[in-house]
Amino acid sequence: LPIKEFVGLGISPEHGNPNAIVELVEELGVKRLLIRVPTWQVEQLDPYLQFAELFQHHRILINVLQDRQHVAEPERWLNTTSRIINSFSALTNEFQLGNAINRSKWGCQNTQDYLNLLDCNVELKRQYPQIQFAGSSVIDFEPLSTLRTLFNFHQYQLDACSALLYVNRRGSPYSKQFGLFDLEKKIRILAALVSLSNRCDHKLWITEVNWPLLNTKPYTPNSGHPRSTVDEDTQAQYLTEYFEIAQQTGLVDRVYWWQLINPGYGLVDHRGDELRKMPSFYAFKRLLEPSHS
């Protein structure tokens, strides 16, 4: 897989001047971009759409975010998601359904809540046969939650499995959870689940990963825990290792770093009067250079 097909980056209209973001994206040379669109902003989609239109020559994945109101009313989720697809379908045919579905702060109190939303995908697929839908959207390595979204007797069908495969709590991508599972093994397990799934085509997209930075509160929630936060040079090293490990497995179609501008875990610090490119910015740029192997 060509490296520009593999490497992706999350961007947001909420941090930084849009024109500056365009320039940063161009400097990096990244072609795949992820933009979050919250369901609770469905009446104010114009700013998100105008932002996305700045990148119409890129390959955009829209991540539709859920909240409790939309989880509690699947019909509302269906209508809102349809409106978002209608708004963005001139720019992209790729949509990720939900985000961190195994964390209650995003509205799903259990996996069944999310399965109720995925049931709407039967209708979405009928309405939009040309759209590629990614789902599962489990954060961290919780294979039982992933399993429930990929093996069941529901009727929905996904085009790709999205995984928010953070490993920062272990430190390095080579560190092992439970003494067994480093990043490569986690990917192999998720890929095996995807390959056997009866609800999903055999594609694995890692749609979020980052390493939070030390001493950057309030921009990262866990700055007080050195075990899961790193200095800027270490972040750049782990970023490089993560993308290289994931690509070398041959089991992942793409990986997106979340996100471009954020002082707590991004590639660029926007505090102060100017945008400061951190070591991870240059590490990400090197990934995309033809000389990188």
Could you tell me what each predicted segment is?
Residues 1-94, 103-141, 153-157, 196-205, ...:
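Non-catalytic accessory regions flanking glycosidase/transglycosidase catalytic cores in CAZymes
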Residues 2-4, 11, 73, 168, ...:
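A generic structural signal for ordered alpha-helices
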Residues 16-18, 41-42, 142-143, 169-170, ...:
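Flexible loop/turn segments at secondary-structure boundaries
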Residues 37-38, 99-100, 165-166, 209, ...:
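Cell-envelope and extracellular/periplasmic
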Residues 66-80, 100-111, 170-176, 215-227, ...:
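Surface-exposed, active-site-proximal loop segments in enzymatic domains
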Residues 111-242:
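Noncatalytic carbohydrate-binding groove/subsite architecture in carbohydrate-active enzymes
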Residues 206-285:
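Aromatic/acidic polysaccharide-binding cleft in carbohydrate-active enzymes
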